[in-house]
Regions:
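Long, hydrophobic alpha-helical segments that serve as membrane-spanning/inserting helices
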Residues: 1-19, 23, 37, 44-260
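Hydrophobic membrane-insertion alpha-helices, especially the h-region
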Residues: 26-41
Length: 260
């Protein structure tokens, strides 16, 4: 092909047909430019296909992370809801020696929840410098918001929850001055890891009576009320996060199905 055009150019020069040669030269330049543009366009298409394939894979992995988030937050929601129920029971129904000892100990719960948003895949995307999901721009902002705004809200609330628990644990020191820890409490704190437990030396009825007395004291009731507020606030945000993650999963599924 190059030889063919070269022969034409030489013939035009030999025949002293400069005007025709000039037109030919301009046409040749235009063809070269068009060829370069086509090559660049093909290269862009290839890069776009590669970026699309990567984005599709990233979305599939993010969907797995979101499913894990819904499971983790749902587990915490159930646990917090149970603690709220026990707290309500403690505020409304602790009044006599028939109160079960295990429910009494549960009502003094000092657990905090550190459930977090799993951003493993999103961080991998950020680390390679991808600021958007090629071919899936319609949900890019929602994904960025989930791993930005939503994640920070969860971190703030769980950090606050841990701080509240730490600052309000002094009541346990007061309680343990008079009430011996029983087998149930040891097993609860040990989370099933203890090989041995030890019986209490306090009279069982006296043991329960003292716990009820503390639970009905101003300090005890304030503890239950603080726990109720803490649990309720955390429950609300965990429900919001679970709902947001579930909605994002649906949107990702829809986008991936449309691209099949």
């Amino acid at each position: 092909m190059i030889k063919f055009f070269r022969k034409i150019r030489q013939k035009l020069l030999t025949e002293d047909k400069f005007s025709k040669y000039l037109i030919y030269a301009i046409g040749e330049i235009i063809l070269v430019v068009i060829g370069i543009l086509i090559a660049l366009q093909i290269n862009n298409w290839n890069e776009s296909r590669k970026d699309f394939a990567k984005s599709k894979n990233y979305l599939s992995e993010i969907r797995k992370d979101l499913v894990g988030d819904t499971i983790a937050f749902n587990r915490s929601i159930k646990s917090i809801s149970a603690s709220i129920d026990v707290g309500e029971w403690a505020l409304n129904r602790i009044h006599d020696n028939t109160s079960p000892i295990d429910s009494l100990w549960m009502s003094f719960d000092g657990t905090y929840w550190d459930t977090s948003v799993n951003d493993r895949t999103f961080q991998r995307v950020q680390n390679v410098g991808d600021s958007k999901f090629t071919g899936f721009e319609s949900i890019t902002d929602e994904i960025n918001n989930y791993y930005g705004i939503t994640k920070r809200r969860v971190e703030y609330k769980t950090s606050w929850d841990e701080k509240e628990v730490s600052e309000n644990q002094s009541y346990m020191r007061d309680l343990e001055k008079y009430i011996e820890i029983d087998e149930y409490r040891m097993n609860m704190d040990g989370a099933g890891t203890l090989e041995k437990t030890f019986s209490i030396r306090q009279d069982s009825l006296e043991h329960v009576r003292m716990m009820i007395e503390f639970a009905n004291s101003t300090r005890g009731r304030n503890h239950f009320k603080n726990n109720y507020v803490r649990h309720s606030r955390l429950l609300n945000i965990f429900k919001e996060v679970k709902e947001t993650a579930a909605e994002l999963i649906i949107k990702i599924n829809k986008e991936l199905e449309q691209m099949e």
